[in-house]
């Protein structure tokens, strides 16, 4: 970059940028060390959600198939409710995945055995691992599906109340 353009407040604040200046800026940014900080609690919860939500989705899908194959008199109702529940969980998973992309959080499964699953994550240059036990996963998935169900029932009751008032 020419001496005339360096440290020139007018040029630096300009929104137009020539390709060679952009290359210089990108080169300078790549030379700066990236901040290595451990993830906050919210970031760890995001990673945990990214692990648990797909498990919940597969469980709900299996239950939908079991309901549809049953001879239950209200199987169509149960199936439809489970499908709404599934859509809600899938929507949340999509949000979690987008947030992880935006936050540059990378999560990969490293290994597993009969009791635990190990994950490696990268967060803004900081790398570490964590472990989730299968017992914790079972319990947490059960609790979360219960919360999603409660939220769905609450929304249904609220809608019924609105309908009665009209």
What are these regions (language model features)?
Residues 67, 73, 78, 82-84, ...:
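Conserved non-transmembrane functional hotspots
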Residues 39, 46-49, 78, 82, ...:
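Hydrophobic alpha-helical segments and helix-packing faces
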Residues 51-54, 58, 83-94:
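Generic structural signal for well-ordered, non-transmembrane alpha-helical segments
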Residues 2-68:
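Long, hydrophobic N-terminal alpha-helical segment
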Residues 88-166:
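Low-complexity intrinsically disordered segments
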Residues 1-2, 164:
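Intrinsically disordered, low-complexity and often Lys/Arg-enriched segments
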């Amino acid at each position: 970059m020419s001496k005339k353009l360096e440290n020139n407040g007018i040029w630096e604040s300009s929104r137009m940028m020539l390709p060679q200046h952009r290359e210089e800026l990108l080169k300078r940014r790549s030379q700066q060390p990236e901040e290595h900080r451990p993830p906050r609690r919210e970031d760890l919860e995001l990673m945990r959600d990214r692990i648990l939500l797909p498990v919940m989705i597969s469980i709900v899908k299996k239950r939908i198939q079991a309901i549809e194959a049953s001879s239950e008199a209200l199987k169509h109702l149960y199936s439809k409710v489970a499908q709404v529940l599934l859509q809600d969980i899938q929507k949340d998973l999509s949000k979690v995945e987008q947030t992880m992309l935006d936050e540059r959080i990378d999560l990969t499964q490293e290994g597993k055995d009969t009791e635990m699953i190990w994950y490696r994550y990268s967060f803004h240059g900081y790398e570490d691992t964590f472990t989730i036990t299968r017992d914790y996963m079972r319990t947490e998935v059960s609790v979360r599906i219960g919360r999603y169900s409660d939220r769905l029932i609450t929304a249904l009751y609220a809608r019924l109340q609105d309908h009665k008032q009209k």
